[in-house]
C-alpha cells in the first residue's frame, strides 16, 4: 500500500490514460483544469485515439452513439439512444463553443477528420478548426472573396507522412467576361500558410511551367525560387497546342513530382 501514489496526479502515464479514457467527453474538459499533467495528456494525439475507442465500446454496449449535428447554424454534440423507449432518444449534450470569437458566429458547414472539426462560417471568410477533446481552436485567414463565400468548397484531410492536417479550398468562379474558372488552394498546418499552384504556358515555345507558392498573405505572395515542373509540350503533342485559359484545371503530387492537367475539348 505504501507504493501507491498519494495523489491522483502522481499516477503513471499508462494508468492515467486508462483512467481518463473511461471518462465521458462532456466531463473530460472539467478534469483538465484539476491537474496540469492530465491537461497535457488529454491533448496528446495518442490519448485522443484511445479515448475514442474506449468510449465507442461503452456506447456500443448501450446502443448509444454520439454525433456532431448542426441546428440553426450552431454545432452540437448529440447523444442518440436506440433502446430508449421512454425518454427522448436524442439528447443535446453541449454546444461547440469558440472561446476566441468576439461575436456570435454562425456555421454553414462542418467537416471531420481524425478528431478535428473544420467549421465553415456563414458570413465570415475565416475558417476555424476545433479539437473537441482539448478545446483548442485555430482561426485561419483566407484570401477568398467575402462576397462569394458560397462559391467555395472545402475538405479536411490528414497527411500521415508529415503528421499534419491539411485543408483543400476549391472555388468555382463565373463571370460573363472570362467564363468559368477554378481555383485550388491548400492550407498546411505545419507552416500555417496557404499554398497555391499556378500553371503558366508560353505562347512562343509552348513551354509549360508549374509554380508553387511558399506563402500567401493578403498583400504579398511568395513563390519558390524554382518552378515545380517544366515540360516542353511540343515533344508530347508534336504540334502547336495551348491549354484553355478558362476550361483547363490540374493537380500536382509534390512527393512524386507528378502533374495531371485536364483540358476541356482535348482527347489527351
From Swiss-Prot:
InterPro entries listed in its UniProt record: F-box-assoc_dom_typ1 (IPR006527), F-box-assoc_interact_dom (IPR017451), F-box-like_dom_sf (IPR036047), F-box_dom (IPR001810), SCF_F-box_component (IPR050796)
NCBIfam families per record: F_box_assoc_1
Residue ranges of domain F-box in the record: 5-51
The protein's name: Putative F-box protein At3g23420
Source organism, top-level taxon: Eukaryota
SUPFAM superfamilies with a match to the protein in the record: F-box domain (SSF81383)
